[in-house]
Design a protein with these regions (language model features):
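Intrinsic disorder/low-complexity segments
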Residues: 1-15
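Catalytic alpha-helical scaffold of carbohydrate-active enzymes acting on polysaccharides/glycoconjugates
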Residues: 14-134, 139-181
Length: 181
């Protein structure tokens, strides 16, 4: 394996260009899986939101460096921060869906997943006026046991998913998944 400028060369024949992608999950501290047993969705409104101010700071940094990213946004955040959605889009960034309520796919069924993701997609598309093409599952929770979610995403009109990691982990990952598309 050899790195040459903007590409990798493997042996004599296999070569591919290096593509760097920056993606950001737009969620607040109380949404994370580590707090799921302590702070439930009905309690989220009791906590001060930090996601808006932190994301604005991040947008300023990206703008100074002329860097574009994909922001996978929770529908819950989009409902409460519509100006943030607009600012992300106006900065030339892509907006993807991170679902509505940051629920691990394995904790629900297909019907609940479809409802959550459809709700978020509708909110984001209404606010942006553009089609939301990408999706990332909360806590990367598409696993070998929840691959049915990919079919649902296709049925909802998503063009790509960014939820699968080729790693061993207690909550996420598909160890034998390919590292490259």
């Amino acid at each position: 394996r050899e790195f040459q400028g903007d590409s990798f060369r493997f042996g004599r024949s296999l070569r591919f260009d290096v593509i760097n992608a920056l993606t950001i999950d737009v969620e607040d501290y109380f949404h994370v899986e580590a707090f799921a047993n302590v702070i439930g969705p009905n309690d989220w409104c009791r906590y001060p939101m930090r996601v808006e101010s932190n994301t604005y700071r991040l947008l300023e940094l990206l703008d100074r460096r002329a860097v574009r990213a994909t922001f996978f946004m929770l529908g819950w955040v989009a409902e409460r921060c519509p100006s943030l959605v607009r600012q992300i889009l106006d900065g030339g960034h892509e907006i993807g869906s991170h679902g509505y309520g940051h629920q691990m796919i394995s904790r629900g069924d297909e019907k609940a997943f479809r409802r959550d993701v459809g709700r978020a997609k509708s909110i984001l598309e209404d606010q942006t006026g553009t089609k939301v093409k990408g999706y990332r599952a909360p806590s990367y929770s598409i696993t070998s046991k929840t691959l049915w979610a990919l079919e649902v995403l296709g049925e909802l009109g998503f063009e790509y998913d960014s939820s699968i990691f080729p790693v061993h982990h207690d909550y996420y990952g598909i160890p034998d998944a390919p590292r490259f598309p």
